[in-house]
Curated annotation (Swiss-Prot):
The keyword Magnesium does not apply. Belongs to the universal ribosomal protein uS4 family. Keywords: Ribonucleoprotein, Ribosomal protein, RNA-binding, rRNA-binding. SUPFAM superfamilies: Alpha-L RNA-binding motif. Residues 87-148 form the S4 RNA-binding domain. It comes from the Bacteria. One of its GO terms (molecular function) is structural constituent of ribosome. It comes from Clostridium novyi (strain NT). This is Small ribosomal subunit protein uS4B. One of the primary rRNA binding proteins, it binds directly to 16S rRNA where it nucleates assembly of the body of the 30S subunit. With S5 and S12 plays an important role in translational accuracy. The gene is rpsD2. Part of the 30S ribosomal subunit. Contacts protein S5. The interaction surface between S4 and S5 is involved in control of translational fidelity. One of its GO terms (biological process) is translation.
């Protein structure tokens, strides 16, 4: 399976946003804004696409499929794109708090640590439906890394996800609105790039 191999902190600094949430990621990032000439429209569109791909850890071929699917939606294309990505299983494992990064969440899914409605799903791109429960397998609940992630992130709540801390479960209760999705990107620029 293809992976995004660029060092995480270097990627965050290059894109000008803290993709992975680590406090050290943006060290020396201030120089980015003052470097070089004013960016062209194409440059801005390309940068925004790279941000979205980095946030969700999606490769180009797969990302293009998401864009094409979003373009067929009745919703605003940019909003539809982010909603599709937000409902990926690996992303929801991260949003629920089982993992401290998208990379760790994808690894957990690949290794069979996650159940959806009681059944193992090991496909990171699986599209979680409204009402489906995402659960950490029993035998991994005593793993300090996973349990600490889940309990330490109690303060990070999203209105479209319901958490059950006693049972290590999260549920997608509705599709999120764009303003609720916690990523800093210009999705309109991304759509413009693929509309040419």
């Amino acid at each position: 399976m293809a992976k995004m191999r660029q060092p995480r902190f270097k990627l965050s600094r290059r894109l000008g946003v803290n993709i992975y949430g680590h406090p050290k990621a943006m060290k020396r990032a201030e120089g980015i804004k003052s470097r070089g000439k004013k960016m062209s429209d194409y440059g801005i569109q390309l940068l925004e696409k790279q941000k979205v791909r980095a946030y969700y850890g999606v490769m180009e071929k797969q990302f293009r499929r998401y864009v094409e699917k979003a373009m067929k939606s009745k919703d605003v294309t940019g909003d539809a794109l982010l909603k599709l990505l937000e409902c990926r299983l690996d992303n929801l494992v991260y949003r629920i708090g089982f993992a401290n990064s998208i990379r760790q969440a994808r690894q957990m899914v690949n290794h069979g640590h996650i159940l959806v409605n009681g059944s193992k799903v090991d496909i990171p791109s699986y599209e979680v439906k409204v009402g489906e429960e995402v659960t950490l397998k029993d035998k991994y609940r005593k793993n300090e890394m996973f349990s600490n992630n889940f309990l330490e992130l109690r303060t990070f709540e999203l209105p479209y996800i319901e958490k059950d801390y006693d049972n290590f479960t999260g549920k997608l209760i509705r599709i999120p609105n764009r303003e609720e999705i916690p990523i800093e990107v210009n999705e309109v620029a991304v759509v413009e790039l693929y509309s040419k």
